[in-house]
């Protein structure tokens, strides 16, 4: 197999015009003939480039409003023709070899994302000729290069210059794989969209699938291989969404430290998503995917100091997330006090980074400042299937709350209730959070009975000498019995925030009234499993 193939003729037909003029200029300057279609050809001609319209080359005009323009033997024969094997038949029919194909596809995803997108709009944005050329060129990568990403343009020009106008086989093979990934993702988007408009294969086969398609096609890009998974006997890798915009562990930049482990990534995600809930300077410390300390402060140093107080024992070897720039004072407080696996913040000051350099094993990440959260899907693998749901982006405000007890909460109790409600959303169910003055003082996570989560939160507070009396308590789901309220009253809780909705709500409210506890219903649950 010939390793290098000279590039003499290029076919360019792109929907995304970014960088195409500069790339075509570079090709033309290197003596490469340019073929093009429709809007791409007009753009290149307007830029003064010598370009031949595909319709002039084939002798067959574009037709049907552009639906048919490249579906012609002189195009696909030039792409699929095997050099040294099909030369005779190509010459017989006047087919010129095409050495590089530059194509990206109609913007189907952007079209169907529009609220006013009609079925006709969606259909007209299904690319036919583009994917056909992409797959043809990728199949014949032995002889032809296929380019589907504008980010590859500079590297291709560099390789042409370094190889006397040729591209090597490893480059063509890699480009072909990118092309197959591209068309697979494109077809997946189309199938997912139309799959919501037809009945599912199982269940109610009379109604359209609706929000979730009847066949779910997912495309993720591998970011890194892990040393191992959750445990050392499990292999693992980290895959990310393409073009994700939201600040996240997937988009974060690592400034120092060892490679992130599987558990590091999972815990960092939990910490970062929790700290995003707060607008004031906040710190979240996570251990084994559960917050073990959360606080708001006048500064991130104050927030860290208060979050650490909740549970210093569990904070050892934890993940720390901030919603403000990490400064030197806070960085120094962390590394002088505790062992930490990961620190993540929107940005890190140069002084803080210089201090952290003394602890090279500490993984330091920046994620950029975030705006509004993006809607999306969450997945949970079960044996033989996949559970899919919308991301839990729900959160109540003071205006959404219902006070159901005889006593009204004070302003401070209301602030503390909303604070610990935000934290409870990120604690594994059954989740109980005690908080006072915008600081967690006890967290009970993952217990099979809610009353034991309440008891554990009280034990945690007592172990650290934190005063519970006058604190608020949040529960991620309703109290099925009054025992959780009795346990809270026994340690001095004066305000409880919970979803409500139990068949025994009246008994639970009566228990709150007996103890003089203010009880707030959110009418929103935050199970987390």
From Swiss-Prot:
Catalytic activity: (6R)-10-formyltetrahydrofolate + 5-amino-1-(5-phospho-beta-D-ribosyl)imidazole-4-carboxamide = 5-formamido-1-(5-phospho-D-ribosyl)imidazole-4-carboxamide + (6S)-5,6,7,8-tetrahydrofolate; IMP + H2O = 5-formamido-1-(5-phospho-D-ribosyl)imidazole-4-carboxamide
Matches recorded under SUPFAM superfamilies: Cytidine deaminase-like, Methylglyoxal synthase-like
EC number annotated for this UniProt entry: 2.1.2.3, 3.5.4.10
Pathway the protein takes part in: Purine metabolism; IMP biosynthesis via de novo pathway; 5-formamido-1-(5-phospho-D-ribosyl)imidazole-4-carboxamide from 5-amino-1-(5-phospho-D-ribosyl)imidazole-4-carboxamide (10-formyl THF route): step 1/1; Purine metabolism; IMP biosynthesis via de novo pathway; IMP from 5-formamido-1-(5-phospho-D-ribosyl)imidazole-4-carboxamide: step 1/1
CDD domains assigned: IMPCH (cd01421)
Family as reported in the entry's similarity comment: Belongs to the PurH family.
Domains as described in the record: The IMP cyclohydrolase activity resides in the N-terminal region.
Name the UniProt record assigns to this protein: Bifunctional purine biosynthesis protein PurH
């Amino acid at each position: 197999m010939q390793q290098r193939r000279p590039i003499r003729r290029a076919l360019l037909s792109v929907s995304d015009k970014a960088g195409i003029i500069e790339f075509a200029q570079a090709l033309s300057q290197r003596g490469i003939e340019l073929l093009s279609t429709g809007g791409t050809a007009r753009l290149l001609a307007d830029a003064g480039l010598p370009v031949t319209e595909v319709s002039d080359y084939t002798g067959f005009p574009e037709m049907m409003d552009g639906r048919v323009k490249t579906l012609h033997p002189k195009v696909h024969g030039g792409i699929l023709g095997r050099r040294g094997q099909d030369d005779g038949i190509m010459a017989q029919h006047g087919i010129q070899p095409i050495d590089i194909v530059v194509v990206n596809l109609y913007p189907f995803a952007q079209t169907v994302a529009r609220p006013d997108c009609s079925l006709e709009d969606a259909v007209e944005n299904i690319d036919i000729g583009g994917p056909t050329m992409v797959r043809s060129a990728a199949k014949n990568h032995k002889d032809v290069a296929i380019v589907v990403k504008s980010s590859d343009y500079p590297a291709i020009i560099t390789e042409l210059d370094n190889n006397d106008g040729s591209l090597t086989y490893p480059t063509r093979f890699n480009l072909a794989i990118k092309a197959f990934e591209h068309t697979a993702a494109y077809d997946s988007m189309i199938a997912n969209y139309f799959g919501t408009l037809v009945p599912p294969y199982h269940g109610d086969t009379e109604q359209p699938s609706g929000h979730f398609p009847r066949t779910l096609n997912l495309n993720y890009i591998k970011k890194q291989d892990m040393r191992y998974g959750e445990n050392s006997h499990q292999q693992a890798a980290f895959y990310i969404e393409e073009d994700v915009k939201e600040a996240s562990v997937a988009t974060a930049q690592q400034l120092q430290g060892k490679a992130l482990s599987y558990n590091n990534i999972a815990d960092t995600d939990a910490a970062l998503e929790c700290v995003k809930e707060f607008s004031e300077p906040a710190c979240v410390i996570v251990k084994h995917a559960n917050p073990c300390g959360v606080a708001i402060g006048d500064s991130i140093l104050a927030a860290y100091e208060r979050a650490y107080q909740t549970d210093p024992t569990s904070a050892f070897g934890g993940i720390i997330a901030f919603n403000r720039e990490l400064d030197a004072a806070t960085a120094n407080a962390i590394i002088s006090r505790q062992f930490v696996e990961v620190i993540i913040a929107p940005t890190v000051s140069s002084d803080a980074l210089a201090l952290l350099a003394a602890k090279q094993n500490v993984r330091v990440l920046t994620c950029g400042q975030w705006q509004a959260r993006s809607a999306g899907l969450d997945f949970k693998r079960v044996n033989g299937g996949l559970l899919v749901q919308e991301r839990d982006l729900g959160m109540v405000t003071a205006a959404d709350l219902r006070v159901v007890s005889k006593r009204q909460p004070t302003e401070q109790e209301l602030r503390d209730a909303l604070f610990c409600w935000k934290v409870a959303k990120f604690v594994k169910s059954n989740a109980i959070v005690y908080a006072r003055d915008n600081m967690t003082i006890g967290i009970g996570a993952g217990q099979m009975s809610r009353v034991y989560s309440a008891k554990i939160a009280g034990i945690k507070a007592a172990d650290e000498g934190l005063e519970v009396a006058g604190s608020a308590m949040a529960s991620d789901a309703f109290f099925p019995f009054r025992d959780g309220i009795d346990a809270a009253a026994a340690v001095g809780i004066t305000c409880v925030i919970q979803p409500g909705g139990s068949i025994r709500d009246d008994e639970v409210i009566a228990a709150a009234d007996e103890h003089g506890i203010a009880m707030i219903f959110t009418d929103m649950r935050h199970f987390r499993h």
